[in-house]
Design a protein with these regions (language model features):
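Intrinsically disordered, compositionally biased, charge-dense segments
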Residues: 1-15, 123
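Active-site neighborhood of HAD-like aspartate-dependent phosphohydrolases
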Residues: 9-53
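Conserved Lys-Pro-Asp/Glu-containing loop-to-beta segment of HAD-superfamily phosphomonoesterases
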Residues: 15, 110-139
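Short catalytic/ligand-binding loop motif for oxyanion handling, primarily in non-cytosolic enzymes
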Residues: 25-28, 33, 73-75, 82-86, ...
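Substrate-recognition element of Asp-dependent hydrolases with the DxDx(T/V) motif
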Residues: 55-56, 61-93, 99
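Structural recognition of alpha->loop->beta junctions
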Residues: 95-111, 169-170
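Acidic, Mg2+-coordinating phosphoryl-transfer loop and its flanking beta/alpha structural elements
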Residues: 128-166
Length: 170
């Protein structure tokens, strides 16, 4: 006979964690337009300190968000290391404000970490079920999967929605 937790795990979808930059916020076009070249790690000092508040949404961000919001996702987004200067000091606050402004996501649905810590959310802390990460950075997907999670490599909203449906989301 199955336990209650086994039944719950069978019928409850995994928790979705969604990256911000490159999935719903357009970091690349903003920084490229501002700098006149592709962003590199040497460019942090040339960006406005409130850059994360100024990012435009990705063109299809509202399509993706319109689909995943029914599953009560968390935003799992990385902030620059402290050594990156003033932008790092306010990045967590600006990212939180950006999500509230653009998608009405409250701060308690935000998980803001250094990139290397994203993988710590790959498994559910209670029942060890794998969680899902939607991310445009393949390195994050590989680390997530190595930690036991399910990675969805984001290319565009439609491909991500199709991948989630293949996993079993309605």
């Amino acid at each position: 006979m199955k336990s209650f937790s086994q039944h719950l795990t069978e019928f409850d979808n995994p928790q979705i964690y969604c990256d911000m930059d490159g999935v719903v916020a357009d970091f690349i076009s903003y920084t490229t337009n501002l700098l006149g070249h592709k962003f590199t790690d040497n460019d942090w000092d040339d960006l406005p300190v409130d850059m994360f508040l100024q990012l435009p949404p990705m063109k299809d961000a509202h399509v993706l968000w319109g689909y995943i919001k029914q599953f009560q996702p968390f935003m799992l987004t990385a902030v620059p290391r402290e050594s990156r200067g003033p932008i790092a000091k306010r990045a967590w606050k600006d990212k939180t404000r950006w999500m509230l402004k653009n998608f009405k996501l409250p701060s308690n649905r935000m998980k803001i970490v250094l990139r290397k810590h994203k993988k710590n959310f790959a498994m559910d802390g209670r029942d060890k079920r794998p969680n899902i990460l939607i991310d445009d950075h393949m390195g994050n997907i590989k680390e997530w999967e190595s930690a036991g999670g399910i990675g969805v490599h984001h290319i565009n909203a439609n491909s991500t929605i199709n991948d989630l449906k293949k996993i079993g989301f309605p």
